[in-house]
Amino acid sequence: MPDTLNLDQANLTRQEAADRSALISTHDYDVHVDVSGAQDLDRVDYPTVTTLSFSCAAPGSSTFLDYLHHSVETVELNGVMLDVHQVVGAARILLPDLQAENTVTVVGTSLYSSSGEGMHRFQDPADGQVYLYTQYEPADARRVFPNFEQPDLKARFTVHLTGPADWVLASNQPESGRRVVEQGEGPDGGSVTVDFSHTPALSTYITTLLAGPYHRVEDTWGGHPESGAPEVRLGLYCRQTMATALDSDTLFTVTKAGLDFFHELFGVPYLWGKYDQAFVPEYNLGAMENPGLVTFTEQYLFESQATQAQFEGRANTIMHEMAHMWFGDLVTMTWWDDLWLKESFADYMGTLAVAEATEHTGSWTTFASRRKAWAYVQDQYPTTHPIFADITDLEAARQNFDGITYAKGASVLKQLAAYVGRDAFISASREYFARHAWGNAELADFLAVLGEASGQDMQAWAEAWLQTSGVPELWLEAQGDTGDLVVRQEGFDPAAGRTVLRPHVLKVGRYEPDAQGVLARVSSAEVEVPGGSTGDRTVVENLPGGTNGGTRLLLVNDEDLTYAKIRLDEESLRAVLAHPVQDSLARATVWAALWSMTRDGLMPSRQFVDAVARLSAQIPDVGVYSQVIDQAVTAVEHFAPAAEREQVRAVLAKALTDALRRIGPGSDRQRSALRSLGRLARGAGEQTADRFVQVLEPLAHQDQTDLPDGLAVDAEARWIGLNALAALGRVDRPTLDAAREDEVTARTTAWHWTAVAALPEPRMRTRAWNAVMAGRLDGQQLSNDHLTALAQGFTASRPDLAAPFTDRFWPELEGIWSSRSNGLASRTIHGLFPATQDAVPGGPAAQESHPVVQSAQSWLDDHPAAPRALRRIIVEELDDLRRALRAQAS
């Protein structure tokens, strides 16, 4: 350990982690956290006592603990009290002169959080009750208790949690004992300490705590004798005021189906003692795979009408987190370079489980439409990176929970299963668990078992797919000399600056109109595209029908087996712009191709919106339908030229209002159309505003008489109307306040904040800007959700209203980053970036002279040493802006 260790440095590097891992081996943690005073909101901290035992390979050496504390009272190492003034910094605690076997005890206090990082505290606006939960990944366990915060230093944890006697107190493992604390601080004067059974070996980032007056429902999964899995107790938690939205029967059905599926698939028992799932407020993520106590955003509890796409999305997240019990929890990556070893696998396995074990059999269609869209966007940024990434420190790790690590990785694993065969892929997974259970692994470890299972050397495949960046592009063309149909491929790795042609196993489909004018598959052919120098041109064999004749669609990547942007030939493009597609996966693939063309400036936004207006009503899959109409809204707001925007908006508005009246009353697609209509309305100019007001005003006033049949005026629908009317200046603050008082919940509170911030009044605009920049409003610290709500309102209406604040944005960036947690700083900067702009005259190249483009680029040029994570946000936002302006100017 270097003599000049900076005890205030929170950004642990990969090299520091490797050095520490080589020096020490962790054994056991005993962690006691006391939240009995949490209901006193003036109290900012809580006490912790942590005892940790570990071995040292080089006695006499030094190491350090990670701890982002409020205070440290004592540090005792091997029976010796250390001078806290000498060994304690803001982020680390020095442990000098180690013995072969060591025990350290730290007594300190930690801070409650309002950012969703560490110990988050939330007060329910409906009943005043206080709720706590923890969120640690990648490195926020150190905000709660001192530890060695890196994934390869696994240990057994024994946890004790003190809190009010009438609260639920929970952790990863089942309760093993409970004792009364004589002088507690709970509302009834009593507190208890709950002891939990010790865990198997696990990493710090997947330990967890839950405390509060949570509503609980229980059930049991019967086990899986073939794999040796015992009966498992199941639990569901939510806030008391969310209990009516907790559809426990559905949630338990999905959970049991997942446990059955993964035990059959992996043959490895779940051995974490219980399987609780908690739905918590103000959550930064979709969910977190804490073994024994998985946490989810309570957005997955539906208080208003929910679509099947929402239920499918929730089921997918449940399965994703469950897959982590094996990929991530049982076997954990050594360092964050290999984050894909858990996230890519969980994304793939989660979608597979939903498709094969639940009623949502079309989950691969939704994956093709939604998840891959995220991947394609992320992979085209200047910040793109390989799936197996170069993560030098924790700050870089936080930024790589992105569409590449999740959705691109999952798509590549789907291609891998096609490449080596599903049986070989699953066999490799089983062997991977057998070899590395309760330990850590790296890319080479998985490639080794995959090579054995498939009988192939997988190194070249891994180099092409896992260790390069960028999106391959595939298209079909007729070979000039022979007339053969060939698959063409282009690929460029922007990170390495070189061409890369990847191997693909894919299908090419031929579609022709049926009697109803719907494009139906008439033939298909499997094609093996080689990687390397011969991968640019591959002949398609055995595709009946040829390349000439009447209307037809030739679709490369039929069945969506691989990861690539698809180019459509001119005849195929004409076909899909005139006819709907019958097959759900093909339909999703076609719409993804059209959206890529729009984003790339190859298809005018007007043409894309026209296609959506004409054809979207014939998309039966609500997940694809909602994605496509949302993309059309984005096309209007960001890609349509200013001179055409209101005309294009009117085309889409008519299509959506027609959908409200003609699509099945009360249907999922009707609700999706309403949501998109609300988004589209917020930026409307005077010439189109009245069209929206006619539909949205009755919603805002809960007047069912003038609404389309089946359109329920629930809380969500009402606030869709109110938020749009606020942005248009067609409702006032007292009306918004009164609506909020009608129904006080966490969600209506956030919607109210957004609506007030959206009011097109200079005073409200300034109030919202100042609050987000200060992180406080009316003397109250903003939580993560409230900060986002204000930022969304600030940017909701016409861009000219936010323009006066643009020049004030850039000087604040470094101060925001240094003074806030990573999560809150990211929300602030993403939320206030001036992303909605009109192109300047002069064509695509002239957009480099756009004032906001110049300001953003100047900031990057002037701040080369700014934190990489901060620079990445600006680089990506700037890339989005450049893309939009170029499309407008094309």
Where are these regions (language model features)?
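Charged, low-complexity, helix-prone segments enriched in Lys/Glu/Asp/Gln
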Residues: D19-V33, F157, S248, A353, ...
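Hydrophobic alpha-helical and helix-loop surface patches within well-folded domains
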Residues: M1, D8, F196, H224-P230, ...
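Short, mixed-charge, low-aromatic patches
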Residues: T4, S114-E117, T204-P213, Y270-G273, ...
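Small/polar loops that bind or transfer phosphate-bearing groups
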Residues: Y67, I318, V756
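General secondary-structure propensity
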Residues: D30-Q39, T332, P734-A739
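Non-catalytic accessory/interaction domains
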Residues: P2-T4, G163, V168, Y237, ...
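Alpha-helical structural motif
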Residues: S25-H27, Y46, E137, L153-A155, ...
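Acidic/His-enriched low-complexity segments
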Residues: M1-G273, Q299, Y376-V377, F401-A407, ...
